[in-house]
Amino acid sequence: MLDMKFLRENPELVKENIKKKFQDEKLPLVDEVIALDAANRAAITEASELRASRNALSKQIGMLMGQAKKDPSKLEEAEKIKATVKANADRLAELEKLEEEYEQKIHKIMLLIPNIIDPSVPIGPDDSCNVEVERFGEPKVPDFEIPYHTQIMESFDGVDMDAAGRVSGAGFYYLLGDIARLHEAVLAYARDFMIDKGFTFCIPPFMIHGNVYEGVMSQNDMDAMMYKIEGEDLYLIGTSEHSMVGRFIGEILPESSLPQTLTSYSPCFRKEKGSHGIEERGVYRIHQFEKQEMIVVCKPEDSMDWYNRMWKWSVELFRSLDIPVRQLECCSGDLADLKVKSCDIEAWSPRQKKYFEVCSCSNLGDAQARRLKIRVKGEDGKMYLPHTLNNTVVAPPRMLIAFLENNLQADGSVLIPKVLQPYMGGKTVLTPKK
């Protein structure tokens, strides 16, 4: 969400940014919101003048009423002024109603206008234009056939998709035995990994109010992703970054408290509307999963430094699990409206012989802070908006796919990397049961 003053003073820049994001249908919104803003400011000015006039006229009436004790003709003059005050009061009520209507319309439009992207963002309409930046680790190409990930899990009696389908429908799963333990081990390792980086571990609310969601994501994304609790102003979270950032809603943070660095575990719930291909079946794209997430609230001048640190930590974590990865810079058309800059970390799939997304790191500038009314009080006493960032530490369903494929041996066993062994009871290898 942009600052109205910034938009008013830079309409062409805002329009050019909309074009870069291939959202030309939003171009008329810029002129529309500027016109509404002008009308609103005119109404505010007139209302302010009427309030000042009311105060002056009220004093005048008081003087005339006092003078009327000696000069009754002053009563008639006072009554005329009272009539003017009444007319002004009626007009003031109209203006206050207009202001409310204008502000609601302005707010609604401002939520639709995308944030200004960073100059370094590549321009393109969709994720096909995302740019590979760097690879980390040599992609593995084994000399044996790697089964589909659910087949690997089934060889350990580790997954039951059929039972989950009967109980909950498509997009759910039961994890069992060593696979369930591996799932929890990855989460525990990721938690400790981030604590070692200086982050505060957090278990946040798993349901949040609608106004918090409006503050952290676009309405379109919200409608496509979120499950609403019927009859309640509550939504199941699609990612814990939303409830972690929401922790600071309406707060004034002392500058000395920055940066705020939180890492959280949570279940996540997503509608995942739309049809997907065979490679998005199994546990790749599902309605319920667990995730370790990180967020940072920081000074504006520090946000790009944090951005680079955060995605590099994702690379470090995956490499410690013997998973080759690459960094992809997201193009303009692939950025959600609140994002200034974003990159995906993709893991290597030896079975598909290609990379697939496992993490997403984003700098949202001051967009979330503006929507959520999060402010910082500087050492000089001045208020400003902080920047917010988020990054997936690990989402085990997709992580498990990458982990199993990259650590699978020809005999069907799976090697456990050294860093994960303490979380697996000292096991160095998982042996299939089938």
Where do the model's predicted regions map?
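TRNA-recognition modules of translation machinery and tRNA-sensing kinases, especially anticodon-binding
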Residues: 27, 135-434
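N-terminal alpha-helical targeting/anchoring segments
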Residues: 1-140, 154, 158
